UniProtKB/Swiss-Prot annotation:
Region (Disordered): 898-948, 960-1069
Transmembrane stretches, start-end: 96-116, 831-851
GO molecular function: ligand-gated sodium channel activity
Compositional bias ranges of the Basic and acidic residues kind: 915-928, 967-978
Location relative to the cell: Membrane
Keyword vocabulary terms for this entry: Glycoprotein, Ion channel, Ion transport, Membrane, Sodium, Sodium channel, Sodium transport, Transmembrane, Transmembrane helix, Transport
Alphabetical list of PANTHER family matching this protein: AMILORIDE-SENSITIVE SODIUM CHANNEL-RELATED (PTHR11690), DEGENERIN-LIKE PROTEIN DEL-10 (PTHR11690:SF296)
Cytoplasmic side: 1-95, 852-1069
Lineage: Eukaryota, Metazoa, Ecdysozoa, Nematoda, Chromadorea
GO cellular component terms, semicolon-separated: plasma membrane
Name of the protein this chain belongs to: Degenerin-like protein del-10
InterPro entries xrefs: ENaC
Length: 1069
């Protein structure tokens, strides 16, 4: 009992000896005031006053101690580890354990936060399984050309010759300029149906797909390819039947779909146009997808450039994702709706329908007819070409930039194909090899080819070719069609592609400007466009009237006979010794005779004569008009034909290829370098350079000697004797005047004018030569190389593709959640157990106790009473009782007969009789002492409090006088304690009961019931509705058990009821 008092003091009494108003109070209650239930263990009872009530039963009676509840009571009652140390006497101990508990609580919170964060992130594990079936369904393969529009269709007669409706207002797709042919195309076709226009402008499968072989070696048919529309253009797909897909039985290159494709790079629109220009590189896109899928764009395909043989291995992955924000689990309705494009339940067409909806909302027209044939339910009109290029393309571009991932989720179960590329060079014998190039003799033999699309075969041969029939990839019909299509495309490129068209136009303009420059400067090859050197020099006064002023001299010079040896000796003799010559003019018959007489003087005279004759001869050629040509006498008809062909090409009357081939004929090819050079350039350059400029330069070189001769007077004498035959003074003066005048004119104005004429002619001819060579020696021959269909053509236009399964296996990818709710609960429970020694059930219990302490008491105030049987079963009755009075029960048989067999062996009827006899032998003195002690319990001030020392003294007295007194007062029966009936309890000392140490006994005191006497029923006050007694507060293995003793008759009724329900229970009320 002392230890129990200490436990009471430890839990309810503060450390300080003096109690203030905030300390918990301990009260004594009358038994009449409240009725309490009894439980065979320590108990904590929640009351309606928000207090904790503890009941202690001793051998002398029952003690009730109550106090205000504290926050730690819930943790203590929930059996959390180390919480009881927070009430330790030492502040150091309390602080240390408080820090430890707080640290562990923080660790628990951190761990719980990390686990909750992990749970919210929804981690997923992906499991990969490999299957090796004997047959695998081959996927759908779609071929998409990066070029969406064919040049030959846009610029062909079907569009350019079409009559469109009148335009009201302005077009959305183009401005008002008419310079670009593609703007003209839009004006010509603005009212056409956009889907029809796009399909006609796309690459045809008959032109793009030249060969196809299934994995089993059989050839494909063009009818096996179906049109597949995407937002980036039209594609051609094979193996599209989802119910009957092609199956392969092996993997590797030998089990692939082999394709020979024509990229048709010559059909690309590289012109500077807003809507038709190809913005991607030349090549193809290969799409590999499941038959149930619908591609929305070709940009995600495998790129195949031209000029290579591509091996494209792929692997299949069956993916099964978890339903969530990334995918949708397809139900039966959605699967059935997969064949209806416009069905909102069709998740496979959601992306395309999103594009179409945006087009319809923005442009008030629809393009659904391209994707589904069932468009009768669409009330909106179809988009025309102007609406497509002016509005629909912009609307689809907005959706492409915004993305559709948030509005259109893919199905969770799908088949993905991962492909890669192996690049190799194309074979050399793809196209027939050219053996001999065709070359016509003259341009008249070259004929134009008919470029109408309805013409099946080419009419012009490009030369003799050779191909091995056993290894030929293309037949003759395909080769001829490719050449014809390429010819037509190259022709359109040359006329409408800015870089080619502008370059050709500028080269033609340059040649025409060179010809115009020659004609402007009167250097042309026609009579009306040519002006000779003499005519040009006649503008000089010193040259124009030279013949009139020196007519007599000119006549003498022109009629001067040839000088003989004798006459030459006489002339030299005259110059050497005029006096001797006058005496005997015929003295010397040869120059040798003169040398024998005059020695070296003969050589000086001979040199002077040679200088005078040379200068006079040169000047004579310079001043004589007959020295220059007056008209061009060559055949320049071919040059005129060249200009005519050039004009025809500019007027679109001559094809570029025909023009180039005509210019490459034998006669045309070498005309400019041979005939034109000899008949035009050589005569003019002779007059200007040889006759005029060079002669004047040579005269200037020898003129210093002539000037020396003039100064000493021998020049006039020599000239007079050489040209006039008489060396008199007049002849001398005429000659000197003539040679000086001719030199002054030639070295002055004539020389300057001759330099200008020569420079002008050379410049004009060089420009003509450069322009002619650039156009006819470079541009057109390069253009003709396209029609050789050799390695350059093959590398620019062809590609080979082999699509095959990399390994004969399937990868099945499935996703599972790796961290669910139960994993979170287990981790949080583990963290609680590791750091706090608690569990989730402990947390729930703490919450429950907190609610019980704070809320249940308030609810209990509204209850009138709780039957005693409910309290006995530790249950709280929610419904209130109208009356707690119960009828008197019948006497029951001895309890030992209702107990188990072991109980009956320990307790018999003799034991009950012996107890009755013992109770009747109580002494009066001891009864008085007990009355004095227990009188304190009957104090009218039942709520008076006791100090801890008073409680200790009181408990010591109770222990010494544990038997309660007997009261017999018939006048005040309401003040009797219901347990003061001396006939009810029998107290046996421990020494008389050897069975006290038996199994199941918890104390040296026990209560032995006997059959109750017949008594009248008495009224009982209502029992307050209290909480069930919790077995959780004061447990001590060495302390006596705690009992709560009710009145005998109520105890008998309750024990009988409990015995009937469970014979193994030892606690009763």
């Amino acid at each position: 009992m002392v230890r129990m008092a200490e436990r009471l003091a430890e839990n309810f009494i503060p450390e300080a000896n003096q109690r203030n108003e905030n300390e918990p109070a301990y009260s004594r209650y009358k038994r009449v005031g409240q009725n309490r239930s009894r439980l065979n263990s320590r108990a904590s009872l929640g009351s309606s006053m928000g207090r904790r009530i503890t009941l202690i039963e001793t051998d002398s009676g029952v003690i009730e101690v109550e106090s205000d509840k504290q926050f730690l009571d819930a943790f203590k009652d929930a059996n959390m580890d180390a919480v009881h140390h927070l009430n330790a006497a030492s502040p150091v101990t309390r602080g240390l354990w408080c820090m430890i508990i707080i640290a562990f609580v923080i660790l628990v919170l951190v761990q719980c936060y990390s686990q909750i964060k992990l749970y919210i992130s929804e981690p997923v594990a992906t499991n990969i399984e490999a299957e090796y079936p004997s047959k695998i369904s081959f996927p759908t393969v779609a071929i998409c050309n990066n070029n969406q529009f064919r040049l030959t269709y846009l610029t062909g007669g079907r569009i350019m010759n079409r009559r469109s409706k009148s335009i009201s207002g302005s077009l959305l797709s183009t401005g008002h300029d008419v310079e670009s042919v593609f703007d003209t195309v839009l004006r010509k076709s603005w009212d056409m149906d956009a889907v029809k226009f796009l399909r006609s402008a796309a690459h045809w499968k008959s032109r793009m797909i030249l060969g196809c072989t299934w994995p089993n070696g059989t050839s494909c048919k063009l009818s096996d390819f179906k049109a597949v529309w995407t937002t980036t253009g039209l594609c051609w797909a094979i193996n599209t039947d989802p119910h009957n897909p092609y199956e392969v039985t092996g993997s590797g290159e030998g089990h692939g779909l082999r394709l020979l494709l024509n990229v048709e790079s010559y059909e690309r629109v590289d012109a500077c146009t807003k809507h038709f220009r190809t913005k991607t590189l030349p090549g193809l896109k290969i799409l590999i997808y499941n038959q149930t899928d619908i591609p929305d764009s070709s940009m995600n395909g495998v790129n195949v450039p031209s000029g290579y043989s591509m091996d494209i291995p792929f692997k299949m992955q069956h993916r099964s994702k978890l339903t969530g924000v990334h995918c949708i689990e397809e139900n039966d309705e959605q699967i059935e709706a997969s064949t209806d494009f416009n069905n909102p339940e069709n998740i496979r067409t959601c992306t395309l329908r999103r594009y179409m909806t945006e087009v319809e909302n923005s442009c008030h027209c629809t393009l659904r007819r391209a994707y589904t044939s069932n468009s009768t339910d669409v009330k909106m009109k179809a988009c025309n070409v102007d609406q497509y290029f002016g509005c629909a393309q912009k609307a689809m571009q907005r959706i492409r930039e915004e993305g559709t991932a948030s509005t259109c989720l893919p199905p969770c179960k799908s088949i993905d194909y991962t492909a890669w590329q192996d690049m190799n060079r194309l074979p050399q014998n793809l196209m027939p090899a050219l053996i001999e190039e065709q070359e016509e003799d003259d341009e008249d033999d070259v004929e134009q080819e008919e470029l109408d699309e309805n013409v099946s075969f080419s009419t012009v041969s490009g030369g003799e070719t050779f191909s091995c029939e056993d290894s030929a990839y293309l037949d003759d019909k395909q080769v001829m069609r490719i050449k014809r299509d390429a010819h037509r495309a190259y022709e359109m490129q040359a006329r409408h592609q800015e870089d080619i068209f502008l370059r050709s136009r500028r080269l033609i303009a340059r040649l025409r400007n060179a010809i115009n420059s020659i004609e402007r400067y009167k250097w042309g090859w026609h009579y009306d466009t040519f002006s000779g050197v003499a005519d040009r020099l006649s503008n000089l006064t010193c040259f124009s009237n030279f013949s009139e002023r020196h007519r007599d001299i000119i006549s003498i010079l022109e009629s001067r006979p040839i000088t003989s040896e004798e006459k030459k000796a006489n002339q030299m003799f005259f110059l050497l010794d005029e006096t001797a010559f006058n005496r005997n003019a015929t003295r010397y018959m040869s120059v040798g005779d003169l040398k024998s007489r005059y020695g070296d003087k003969v050589d000086d005279v001979a040199e002077e004569i040679a200088v005078i004759l040379r200068i006079m001869e040169k000047l004579w050629h310079v001043f004589m008009p007959d020295s220059y040509i007056r008209t061009m006498t060559g055949d320049f008809s071919r040059m005129d034909r060249i200009i005519e062909l050039m004009n025809q090409y500019e007027l679109n009357k001559l094809q570029r290829r025909a023009w180039a081939e005509k210019m490459q004929s034998r006669q045309m090819k070498h005309f400019f370098e041979d005939d034109f050079y000899e008949s035009y350039y050589q005569p003019l350059i002779k007059d200007l350079d040889t006759t005029l400029v060079k002669q004047i330069d040579e005269v200037e070189a020898d003129w210093p000697k002539v000037e020396y001769y003039l100064q000493r007077g021998s020049a006039g004498k020599t000239g007079a004797i050489m040209f006039f035959g008489d060396g008199n003074k007049d002849n001398r003066q005429k000659f000197e005047k003539l040679i000086v005048e001719m030199h002054e004119c030639a070295s002055g104005k004539m020389r300057k004018e001759a330099g200008k004429m020569l420079s002008s002619f050379k410049k004009s001819y060089r420009e003509l030569q450069a322009a002619y060579g650039k156009l006819f020696k470079e541009e057109l021959p390069d253009y003709l190389e396209n029609f050789q269909f050799g390695n350059k053509f093959v590398g620019d236009n062809f590609a080979m593709v082999n699509i095959f399964l990399h390994r004969m296996n399937l990868e099945v990818w499935s996703q599972d959640r790796t961290y669910g709710f139960w994993s979170l609960a287990c981790d949080i429970g583990g963290a609680l157990g590791l750091f706090l020694g608690a569990s989730l059930l402990t947390i729930i219990e703490i919450v429950y106790l907190c609610i019980q302490y704070g809320l249940c008491g308030k609810r209990a105030r509204n209850m009138k009473c709780i039957p005693m049987d409910a309290l006995t079963r530790q249950m709280k009755k929610v419904a209130t009782c109208s009356c707690c009075k119960k009828p008197i029960e019948k006497s029951r048989e001895p309890i030992y007969k209702k107990k188990s067999q072991s109980y009956q062996r320990r307790f018999t009827a003799d034991d009950e009789d012996q107890g009755d006899k013992f109770r009747s032998r109580a002494s009066s003195e001891e009864s008085k002492r007990r009355k004095n002690i227990w009188a304190q319990m009957n104090d009218p001030s039942g709520n008076s409090t006791l100090t801890p020392s008073e409680i200790k003294n009181f408990l010591d007295q109770v222990q010494r006088n544990s038997q309660p007194p007997s009261y017999h007062d018939d006048h005040h029966p309401e003040d009797h304690y219901y347990y003061n009936d001396p006939n009810y309890l029998t107290i046996s000392p421990p020494s008389d009961r050897p069975e006290d140490n038996r199994e199941g006994s918890t104390s040296g005191y026990y209560s032995s019931p006997r059959a109750p006497p017949q008594a009248n029923p008495r009224d009982e006050s209502p029992i307050p509705d209290t909480e069930p007694i919790s077995v959780s507060e004061f447990s001590d293995a060495l302390a006596p058990p705690l009992f709560k003793t009710p009145p005998r008759e109520r105890r008998t009724r309750k024990e009988q009821k409990i015995d009937e329900e469970d014979d193994d229970k030892h606690s009763y009320v």
